[in-house]
């Protein structure tokens, strides 16, 4: 525990187990039974917070609440404690002459962290604090370990992630973050359902790792004796459903990528992918900004949010900027005129952009963007027109086939969404997959694998389609002002704890 040495901890463990033994000796179940609550702490505040001390005394409002003891004080025949539930804390006042000898003894010997139920009357103290005067006190669960020091909480950030249950007990901010996360996903579903989308479920284990450029996790199916991959994207199964006639589909689910851990990356994360027949990337741009603005309004009550030092305006319409124009604007390099690989490499050298020898012109354009532009994009910005070399599943632009009808959304210098007009030409798609295979042979283990079954599905005919993927964890980070992805994942990936 943070501010407690091993000797102190061991002493507390011994004392609490002695109390546990004493409770059982008295015939009291220290891990009790169902308790009927009439109100939460927020109910008490919203219903009775505006009443005066005198009004509450006159009304004698009876309530029953339950929660965890977070503070406790008093001696003799009366004492105070603060009891915490999901949304907050409320003070309780326990008098021996009101609850009786046995229940007062339970209160007196209760420890911080114990879960209790209280029946009583709502009142206000002389200083105006809304409280409950107990008429009944029930021990619901005996806590056998002491909570972290109430004044310091969990100082060790890693401990917060490893022992999220302690973080949730001691940090209201952390609890609110995860309540907000749930609301964000709920509003996302509601928006799509109201706009005619069908929620579906597709496999998490794939025979071929496809739909993104990433290293997969592998597993083995014993009964079928075959290697499988944990999905790195949801995309290709959803597009098969578009072929099948499900015209507007989405899935919210876990995706797995065998890559590094950082403040923005976790190997297991949550995505939403959606696809709409007869739409294109411009339609999806509008849907994206409208949906994110809707979520912000419903969950936060505003489209103006604070993230770190930045005030972000999520009200549509957002900036739209071609990747080549963005590079020219922020670095001066101009890729609009067609050029050879040698010319592109020379341009990279002039602008101190690091590249690999195997890169084609499109890869070099993307490196320019990542190294010279990305960290400048603070307000919501759609970057569109990605090179075909880095977009194996996107449709080529009709006016300039070097580029694709694809966009990525950047906010606070982070990618939050990836979308495109889907490539529905099976011949072109096969050629793109073959080009990706050559990249794999040259050492790019994130290049796309060949997927013959997907090609066959396209051969039956997929309508023009717009598709979108949003990393939900990053969206939650944005809307809760969280600096690290670990702050919005209940149980993030961690190294084994060293003894």
Curated annotation (Swiss-Prot):
Its cofactor is Mg(2+). Its EC number is 6.1.1.6. It catalyses: tRNA(Lys) + L-lysine + ATP = L-lysyl-tRNA(Lys) + AMP + diphosphate. Homodimer. It is an enzyme of class 6 (ligase). The keyword Metal-binding applies. It is found in: Cytoplasm. Keywords: Aminoacyl-tRNA synthetase, ATP-binding, Cytoplasm, Ligase, Magnesium, Metal-binding, Nucleotide-binding, Protein biosynthesis. This is Lysine--tRNA ligase. Pfam families: tRNA-synt_2, tRNA_anti-codon. InterPro entries: Aa-tRNA-synt_II, aa-tRNA-synth_II, aa-tRNA-synth_II/BPL/LPL, Lys-tRNA-ligase_II, Lys-tRNA-ligase_II_bac/euk, Lys-tRNA-ligase_II_N, Lys-tRNA-synth_II_C, NA-bd_OB-fold. The gene is lysS. SUPFAM superfamilies: Class II aaRS and biotin synthetases, Nucleic acid-binding proteins. Binds 3 Mg(2+) ions per subunit. Signal peptide: none annotated. One of its GO terms (biological process) is lysyl-tRNA aminoacylation. Belongs to the class-II aminoacyl-tRNA synthetase family. It comes from Bacillus cereus (strain ATCC 14579 / DSM 31 / CCUG 7414 / JCM 2152 / NBRC 15305 / NCIMB 9373 / NCTC 2599 / NRRL B-3711). Mg(2+) 1 binds at residues 408, 415. Mg(2+) 2 binds at residue 415.
């Amino acid at each position: 525990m943070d501010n407690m040495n091993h000797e102190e901890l061991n002493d507390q463990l011994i004392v609490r187990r002695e109390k546990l033994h004493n409770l059982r000796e008295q015939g009291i179940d220290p891990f009790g039974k169902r308790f009927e609550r009439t109100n939460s702490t927020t109910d008490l505040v919203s219903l009775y917070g505006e009443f005066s001390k005198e009004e509450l005394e006159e009304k004698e409002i009876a309530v029953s609440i339950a929660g965890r003891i977070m503070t406790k004080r008093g001696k003799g025949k009366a004492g105070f404690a603060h009891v915490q539930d999901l949304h907050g804390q409320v003070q309780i006042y326990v008098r021996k002459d009101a609850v009786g000898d046995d229940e007062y003894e339970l209160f007196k010997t209760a420890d911080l962290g114990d879960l209790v139920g209280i029946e009583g009357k709502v009142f206000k103290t002389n200083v105006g604090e809304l409280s409950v005067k107990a008429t009944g006190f029930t021990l619901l669960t005996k806590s056998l370990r002491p909570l972290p020091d109430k004044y310091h909480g969990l100082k060790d950030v890693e401990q917060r992630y490893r022992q999220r249950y302690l973080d949730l007990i001691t940090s209201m901010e952390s609890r609110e973050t995860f309540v907000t996360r749930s609301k964000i996903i709920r509003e996302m579903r509601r928006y799509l359902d109201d706009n005619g989308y069908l929620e579906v479920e597709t496999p998490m284990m794939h025979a071929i790792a496809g739909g993104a450029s990433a290293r997969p996790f592998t597993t083995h199916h014993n009964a079928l004796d075959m290697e499988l991959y944990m999905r790195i994207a949801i995309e290709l199964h959803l597009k098969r459903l578009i072929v099948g006639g499900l015209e507007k589909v989405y899935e919210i689910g876990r995706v797995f990528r065998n890559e590094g851990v950082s403040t923005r990356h976790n190997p297991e994360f949550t995505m939403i992918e959606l696809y709409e027949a007869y739409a294109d990337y411009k339609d999806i741009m509008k849907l994206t900004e409208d949906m994110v603005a809707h979520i912000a309004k419903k969950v936060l009550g505003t489209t103006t949010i604070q993230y770190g030092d930045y005030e972000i305006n999520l009200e549509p319409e957002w900036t739209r900027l071609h990747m080549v124009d963005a590079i020219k604007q922020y670095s001066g390099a101009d890729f609009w005129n067609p050029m050879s690989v040698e010319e592109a490499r020379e341009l990279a050298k002039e602008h101190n952009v690091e590249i690999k020898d195997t890169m084609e012109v499109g890869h070099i354009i993307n490196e320019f963007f990542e190294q010279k532009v990305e960290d400048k994009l603070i307000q919501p910005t759609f970057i569109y027109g990605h090179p075909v070399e880095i977009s194996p599943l996107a449709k080529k632009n009709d006016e300039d086939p070097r580029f694709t009808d694809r966009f990525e959304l950047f906010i606070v210098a982070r990618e939050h969404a990836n979308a495109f007009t889907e490539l529905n030409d099976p011949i072109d798609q096969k050629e793109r997959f073959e080009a990706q295979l050559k990249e794999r042979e040259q050492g790019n283990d994130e290049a796309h694998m060949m997927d013959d079954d997907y090609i066959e599905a396209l051969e039956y005919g997929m309508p023009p389609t717009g598709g979108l993927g949003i990393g939900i964890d990053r969206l939650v980070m944005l809307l809760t002002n969280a600096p690290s992805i670990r702050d919005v994942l209940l149980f993030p990936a961690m190294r084994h704890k060293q003894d």
